[in-house]
Swiss-Prot record:
EC number: 1.3.5.2
Gene3D superfamilies: Aldolase class I
Catalytic center residues: 175 (nucleophile)
Cited function: Catalyzes the conversion of dihydroorotate to orotate with quinone as electron acceptor.
PROSITE patterns xrefs: DHODEHASE_1 (PS00911), DHODEHASE_2 (PS00912)
InterPro entries: Aldolase_TIM (IPR013785), DHO_dehydrogenase (IPR050074), Dihydroorotate_DH_1_2 (IPR012135), Dihydroorotate_DH_2 (IPR005719), Dihydroorotate_DH_cat (IPR005720), Dihydroorotate_DH_CS (IPR001295)
Lineage of source species: Bacteria, Pseudomonadati, Pseudomonadota, Gammaproteobacteria, Vibrionales
Binding, substrate: 66, 111-115, 172, 177, 246-247
Protein topology in the membrane: Peripheral membrane protein
Gene, per the UniProt record: pyrD
Taxonomic source organism: Aliivibrio fischeri (strain MJ11)
Cofactor: FMN
Protein name (record): Dihydroorotate dehydrogenase (quinone)
Amino acid sequence: MLYRIARAGIFKLDAEKAHDLAIQNFKRFNGTPLDIFYRQNLASKPVEVMGIKFKNPVGLAAGLDKNGECIEAFGAMGFGFVEVGTVTPRPQSGNDKPRLFRLIEAEGIINRMGFNNLGVDNLVENVKKAKYDGVIGINIGKNKDTPIEKGTEDYLICMEKVYQYAGYIAINISSPNTPGLRTLQYGEALDDLLSQLKEKQKELAEKYGKYVPVALKIAPDLEDDELTQIAESLIKYKIDGVIATNTTLDRSMVEGMKHAEEMGGLSGRPVQTRSTEVVRRLKELLGDNLPIIGVGGIDSYVAAKEKMVAGAELVQVYSGFIYKGPGLVRDIVNNI
């Protein structure tokens, strides 16, 4: 009820201004009596995935806390894990504004943010300071001005810098808002990326004396043969997990709605069915070789359960959280 009242005011603001205001307030309220507005004490529902113990299987998807500024606040809401980023080697401002749009009648969001972030070094400092007893995933990407043929270098730079501080590392090659990025999902480009990531992971595991899992985040807009090839590569290179899915370019579910024709990736309820289909197909292809983290349109316990029945061992929320608030986390954790 409280969030529904607050949302009415928040949704009168420009979407990105509302996001920035929320981040500022979470930073301001954290650790003060005012965090009572979002703090939730949830029952422990521990699971072990990728060799990591999670307090519960519900996580915050990347993109909401790009710079790792509010990790404790999201932890206070009951998330079992928080994925920060996407972060790049160097700071970048992202695409021109406006670049974030609500499709309220569909409970969807279109974004073309373009990996706006303060850089990996800033993120690492925030993660180091965070007092959170859950799992922190760090989502990494490439800078827009890095040629795609040199993109792997950006991932390796970020991986080296975040390795000590990450519970797991997510490799984002599926955002539609960085030109050419999705080409890394295919063929030799994918194999080259995965092989170099595994080599770097082995090197860093020996250096720091701990093994940090690596998960690949993929798009929903993949043909079956493309999905099959990705699954084969994930198994071949012994990648630790896969996150399915990122945002979609498909607009068939939102035709005629305000903002539907805006460029960018569509998330929220409109991508729910397709992302679940990808999870289900991945499970068929992967078997028990590696776990799936399901994300895309999860806006209720029922939607989370659908992802898990399809084959996901963990779930993440973002757009559903924007529309439903912290109560969504409670709903899923209590009923899972």
